[in-house]
Amino acid sequence: ANESMLVAANEGVTKYKLEDGHFELDKKADETLLAAIETGTKADVRQYYLDKAKKELDEKLDEKAYPEAYDKAWDKIVEEIDDKYADAEEKYELNDPDFTEVPVKIYENFFRNEEEDYNNDGEAEGNIRVYAKNDNVDLACLLDGAFPEKADEIAIDRMHADNVGVKVGDEISVSGQRFKVVGLIAYVNYATLHEKSTDMMFDAIKFDVAMVTQEGFNSLHKTVHYFYTWNYVDTPADEVEQKAKSDDFMKALLTQVVCDDKELEDYMPR
């Protein structure tokens, strides 16, 4: 039962392209934002808010027709933005004098949280996190069977399968949709089956992680989680440097995301 944990943990970092960390956004990032994030540089949050506020004010008030009212409104806006930025600056240490740009490589690794009915009795026994097969990051170790090649094929976590009695060749239902289990796997980033990074205990019975083809992923209907992983361009020498890099990268990431009118929903360095 522990094999999926041990194999992934012991061989994972290089062979299975383990991430240096991951983050989730509320909306999908375009190529421009991803390229900006990869530089590791900070965006100018204060200027972003000023530009946005000026555009909104220009739409409401004619500067030439009402110059005094415009100037008064603008002065108030600038004061509010400066207060707002000062709070963010203090909370996230955005003006840290020791900040260093941390270039990274970003990979999309979207998932859906679906309902799993592993015995096809019409009732969901737990949740299954479904990823599309990829070759870039956080790969899976194949422990039995094969990786999915068809839209109705799925590979699920080996430890979960052992615990609930599912074998290669069985069928399971994912949010009411039938899939044939063609493989048992261990994802390198799920050496233990924690559904959330904040979970203290892992649950290998009511939580499963799975791989399908891109076509299979597109056929599902639950909300897509815009989940991105990163690897540092320059590998940290030790845990101290790794911590420093993750702290600096978080500051840069946060500013870039805010200036693209998106929200950072999760951030977890390795």
Predicted regions and their residues:
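Membrane transport/envelope proteins' first extracytoplasmic loop
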Residues: A1-R270
